[in-house]
Structures are given as C-alpha cells and as structure tokens.
C-alpha cells in the first residue's frame, strides 16, 4: 500500500485499496437532485444524435432547442443536494481506511483537509504513546482526552466529506447545463445557416425570373 506521504511527494491525488472502493462513501459520486437535472439526465445522450439528425431534417434541431428551454429553464433548476442518511456519513471505519492509505481519488482541497487532520492525529498519537509508559494501567484503559480528540477529528473528517458532496453536486449541475447549452447553440447555429441558405436560394430564384 502506498502512503499519503509518498503520494504527496509524487503529487498524486490517489491513495489505494480497490477492494474497498464499493464500500467507501468517498468513492460515490453525488449529483444534483433538482427537477431540471433529474429530467435532463436521460435526455442528454440524445442531444448529439438529434444534432446529427438535424443535418438531414432540421426539425431535430428545433426539438433540441425546445428540450433545452423546457428542461433547463422551465423546470425548477435551483441546486438541490442529496438527502444524506446517517449511515451515509463516513465513520471511524472510513477514517481508518484513509489513514491506512486506502487509495481513492480526492479533490486537492479535500486532500488538504485530510493532511491537516492526519498531522493533528499523528501529533496526538505521539504524545499519547510517549506518556503511556509513565501512566497507571487504569488511565490506559480509558483516555477521555483521546476519545475527545478522535471525535473532533471525525467531525472535521465529516466536514471535509460534506465539502466533497457539495463540490460533486455543483459540478454535476454545471456540467449538465453546459452540455445542453453547447449542443443547443450548435443546433441554433445550424438553423441560422439553413435559414440563410433558404433566403439566398429564394433570392436567386427571384433574380433568375
């Protein structure tokens, strides 16, 4: 397994344990839950097809434009986030998976959060084990400060997870709208070119008479 330190040195954004990919909530991609996005997702693959069909029959370009207007503007399109259940939040298991260098792709800002938390956790662990030999066994069994530190670390870890979810939702929303905009601007351009050609042909026919 690769370590986070070596990952930082090589400037990689991946850590490693493919067998945990399905279980780790960090691997899940969260999408916008607004009505516009939900209705647009199944239509998205048809945009380039309708554009190509429009070369033979411009009506398909009109269909693209109408779908763009109806799905992206008529429908509610304010950002809506996934309603996370309690069991979807990362717990100590996922936190341990990160500290043990399970490899998952993370955003740079999330990596920064994890590095800060890891340094904080490592420093506390060193202090704890240095003083361990001089402590009575009763104190070793229950260490309130360590539990509080772990809870604090988990809260920060969950906060980083929420930032990741927010980033995913915003990215999916913007990407979907950008895709619709690009293909439908092409459709609009195709209609304009066809209109200009029709007008040009009509004028030529009138002059030839």
UniProtKB/Swiss-Prot annotation:
Gene Ontology terms: cellular component: endomembrane system; membrane
Keywords: Membrane, Phosphoprotein, Transmembrane, Transmembrane helix
Membrane topology, record value: Multi-pass membrane protein
Induction, as annotated: Induced by alpha-pheromone. Repressed by the ALPHA2-MCM1 repressor.
Transmembrane segments: 50-70, 185-205
Main location: membrane
All ranges on the Cytoplasmic side of the membrane: 71-184
Phosphoserine modification, residue list: 121, 123, 125
Modified sites of kind Phosphothreonine: 153
Biological role: Required for receptor inhibition of inappropriately expressed a-factor receptor (STE3) in MAT a cells. Inhibits signaling by relocalizing the G protein beta-gamma (STE4-STE18) subunit to intracellular membranes. May also be a mechanism for the down-regulation of the mating pheromone response after the zygotic fusion event, promoting the transition of the new diploid cell to vegetative growth.
Name of protein: Protein ASG7
Organism the protein comes from: Saccharomyces cerevisiae (strain YJM789)
Gene field: ASG7
């Amino acid at each position: 397994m690769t370590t986070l330190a070596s990952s930082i040195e090589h400037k990689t954004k991946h850590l490693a344990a493919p067998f945990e990919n399905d279980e780790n909530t960090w691997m899940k991609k969260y999408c916008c839950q607004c009505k516009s996005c939900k209705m647009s997702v199944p239509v998205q693959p048809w945009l380039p097809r309708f554009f190509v069909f429009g070369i033979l029959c411009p009506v398909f370009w009109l269909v693209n434009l109408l779908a763009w207007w109806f799905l992206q503007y008529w429908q509610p399109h304010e950002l809506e986030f996934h309603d996370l259940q309690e069991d979807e939040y990362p717990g100590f298991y996922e936190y341990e998976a990160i500290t043990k260098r399970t490899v998952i792709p993370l955003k740079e800002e999330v990596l920064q959060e994890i590095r800060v938390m890891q340094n904080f956790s490592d420093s506390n662990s060193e202090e704890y084990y240095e003083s361990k030999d001089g402590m009575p066994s009763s104190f070793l069994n229950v260490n309130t400060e360590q539990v509080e530190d772990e809870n604090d670390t988990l809260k920060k870890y969950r906060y980083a997870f929420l930032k990741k979810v927010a980033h995913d939702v915003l990215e999916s929303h913007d990407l979907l709208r950008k895709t619709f905009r690009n293909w439908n601007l092409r459709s609009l351009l195709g209609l304009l070119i066809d209109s200009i050609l029709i007008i040009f042909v009509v004028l030529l026919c009138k002059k030839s008479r």
